[in-house]
């Protein structure tokens, strides 16, 4: 936490540079899971509502909440409009591109997560269960670091970046 706090104290440009670096590793980690898993997917897991929604629509509703939380960062991009050279052009592009990119990765990772192992083995468990079943050991470790660690790190860094902007504006 302290490292991200310091980076954000230095400036938004530095925080953005670190963020881009970490997002590359996050996307590489998720891409690895997709690459190794997409060919192993059992598409029979998607054929019936009972297999997709074993707890009914409640589970689907929870998944929607998680998705909205995960893509909700796009709304906070507007907090950084004052830091941009051309916010009228860049804000909509950033919001649309980041949301579409997140949707593509969420969809592909979800297909792999649901389609590899039987539901009984994965229900209520983390993505690490599926990853350990399909990834070679060294790649699994890289996945945990790339996807797990950097997912958390990018969230922390971006929160420090946007959360203080409205307070700083009020102080001015």
Language-model segment annotations:
Residues 1-40, 54-55, 95-100, 164:
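Membrane-interface loop-to-helix entry segments
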Residues 2-6, 61-68, 143-157:
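Hydrophobic alpha-helical transmembrane segments of multi-pass membrane proteins
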Residues 6-13, 31-42, 81, 108-115, ...:
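Structural signature of transmembrane alpha-helix termini at the membrane-water interface
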Residues 41-53, 119-129:
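Membrane-interface helix termini and inter-helical loops of multi-pass transporters
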Residues 49-57, 84, 130-137:
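Helix-boundary and loop/linker segments of multi-pass membrane transporters
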Residues 68-90:
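Juxtamembrane interface elements at the cytosolic ends of transmembrane helices
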Residues 83-87, 93-101, 158-172:
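Helix-loop-helix connectors at the membrane interface of multi-pass transporters/channels
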Residues 96-157, 172:
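TM-loop-TM module centered on a large, flexible mid-protein loop between adjacent transmembrane helices
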């Amino acid at each position: 936490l302290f490292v991200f706090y310091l980076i954000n104290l230095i400036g938004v440009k530095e925080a953005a540079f670190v963020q881009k670096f970490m997002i590359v590793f996050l996307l590489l980690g998720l891409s690895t899971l997709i690459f190794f898993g997409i060919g192993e997917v059992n598409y029979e897991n998607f054929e019936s509502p009972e297999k997709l929604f074993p707890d009914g629509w409640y589970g689907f509703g929870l998944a929607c909440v998680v998705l909205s939380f995960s893509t909700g960062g796009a709304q906070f991009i507007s907090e950084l409009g004052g830091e941009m050279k051309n916010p009228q052009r860049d804000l909509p592009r950033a919001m649309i591109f980041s949301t579409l990119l997140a949707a593509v990765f969420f969809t592909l990772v979800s297909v792999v997560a649901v389609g590899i192992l039987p539901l009984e083995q994965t229900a209520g468990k983390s993505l690490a269960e599926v990853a350990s079943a399909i990834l070679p050991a060294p790649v699994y470790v890289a996945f945990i670091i790339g996807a797990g660690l950097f997912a958390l790190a990018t969230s922390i860094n971006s929160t420090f970046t946007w959360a203080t902007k409205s307070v700083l504006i009020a102080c001015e």
